[in-house]
């Protein structure tokens, strides 16, 4: 059962924070530059770019409450007219229960875990004076567990969401005029599974959506 349905809105959870350089908030109408959906404003998320050295390596790891593990690693660099950037990130936690046990219930609700994998790669090429192309690809996979509602535990209710993005950007600088040509492919695959007798209808429940 997918309570949220599926649409063209991007799931912001699938952008790993370790790959974000900065976030800009643009208030007011920005339709001229960003399209008709930007009538009230834009949240502009700028991802990290390649460094100025031929090879750079970065990474980090942390561990916290509820067996939460967060790791990421990235390589980037620039060699003459070519730049590259690639990285992988993982977040995994045993989590807490999505549901709250009502008064009088002594059984401990099971924890609802969560795991997210992210991978991305991009390159930049300078073809000629004022002309650049930037191909990129991003992949994200999220797996998690849910409960039925606020006060009802559910041990076999899970979901998975996968997102693949790929595209290419062409920049042409002509004196004071800058032309950007962008192609982007976005594929979303989500599934929800509840195979316990405690499901909403007492039977096996499955929902699968692609966009």
Predicted regions and their residues:
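Short acidic/polar hinge/loop motifs at secondary-structure boundaries
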Residues: 1-27
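Outer-membrane beta-barrel translocator/receptor signature
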Residues: 5-7, 19-21, 32-44, 49-98, ...
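Alpha-helix initiation/capping motif
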Residues: 8, 13, 32, 64, ...
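Transmembrane beta-barrel domains of outer membrane proteins
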Residues: 26, 46, 74-78, 87, ...
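Transmembrane beta-strands of outer-membrane beta-barrel proteins
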Residues: 58-62, 85-89, 124, 136-138, ...
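Flexible loop and strand-edge segments within Gram-negative outer membrane beta-barrel domains
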Residues: 93-100, 106-118, 126-179, 185-208
């Amino acid at each position: 059962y997918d309570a949220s349905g599926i649409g063209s809105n991007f799931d912001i959870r699938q952008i790993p924070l370790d790959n974000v350089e900065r976030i800009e908030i643009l208030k007011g109408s920005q339709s001229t530059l960003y399209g008709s959906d930007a009538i009230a404003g834009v949240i502009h998320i700028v991802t990290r770019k390649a460094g100025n050295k031929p090879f750079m390596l970065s990474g980090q790891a942390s561990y916290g409450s509820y067996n939460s593990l967060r790791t990421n690693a990235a390589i980037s660099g620039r060699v003459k007219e070519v730049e590259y950037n690639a990285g992988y990130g993982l977040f995994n936690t045993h989590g807490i229960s999505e549901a709250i046990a009502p008064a009088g219930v002594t059984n401990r609700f099971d924890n609802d875990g969560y795991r997210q994998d992210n991978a991305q790669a991009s390159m930049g090429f300078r073809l000629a004076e004022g002309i650049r192309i930037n191909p990129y690809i991003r992949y994200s996979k999220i797996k998690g567990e849910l409960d039925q509602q606020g006060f009802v535990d559910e041990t076999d209710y899970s979901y998975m969401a996968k997102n693949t993005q790929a595209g290419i950007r062409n920049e042409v600088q002509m004196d004071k005029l800058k032309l950007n040509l962008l192609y982007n492919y976005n594929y979303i695959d989500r599934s929800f599974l509840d195979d316990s007798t405690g499901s909403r209808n007492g039977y096996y429940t499955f929902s699968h959506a692609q966009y």
